[in-house]
Amino acid sequence: MTMTDPIADMLSRVRNASNAFHESVSMPSSKIKANIAEILKEEGYIADYTVNDAKVGKTLDIELKYGPSRERSISGLRRVSKPGLRVYAKSNELPQVLGGLGVAIISTSHGLLTDREAQNKGVGGEVLAYVW
């Protein structure tokens, strides 16, 4: 059976693993999931990620990051643009997550960017998710 929304599945797996204080989480890999993991790593929400070859397809392993007293680095993840309701934003209308404390992941013609990078480049696109 095919998955309707693989990005929502990825975000749910990361959210559930973080809430259960798991060290890592594994999922089927794709280019867009690897790009989202790269943004999460650059922004400091996860420790690291690897893409491994499996017998069938590839797997994406994400190492979660916690503070010294086991506080979560990811407070929340929210899927914005869904298959049934796409959400687009112009470069001057890009959303700020928690007044700039969080990150919006935007799919643009320049690839996946954070809201700040898209604002600096002057491009808009599809708002995939909020992370805070």
UniProtKB/Swiss-Prot annotation:
SUPFAM superfamilies: Ribosomal protein S8 (SSF56047). The gene is rpsH. NCBIfam families: PRK00136.1 (NF001109). One of its GO terms (cellular component) is ribonucleoprotein complex. Gene3D superfamilies: 3.30.1370.30, 3.30.1490.10. GO terms for molecular function: rRNA binding; structural constituent of ribosome. Keywords: Ribonucleoprotein, Ribosomal protein, RNA-binding, rRNA-binding. It comes from Corynebacterium jeikeium (strain K411). Pfam families: Ribosomal_S8. It comes from the Bacteria. One of the primary rRNA binding proteins, it binds directly to 16S rRNA central domain where it helps coordinate assembly of the platform of the 30S subunit. Part of the 30S ribosomal subunit. Contacts proteins S5 and S12. GO terms for biological process: translation. This is Small ribosomal subunit protein uS8. Belongs to the universal ribosomal protein uS8 family. Transmembrane segments: none annotated.
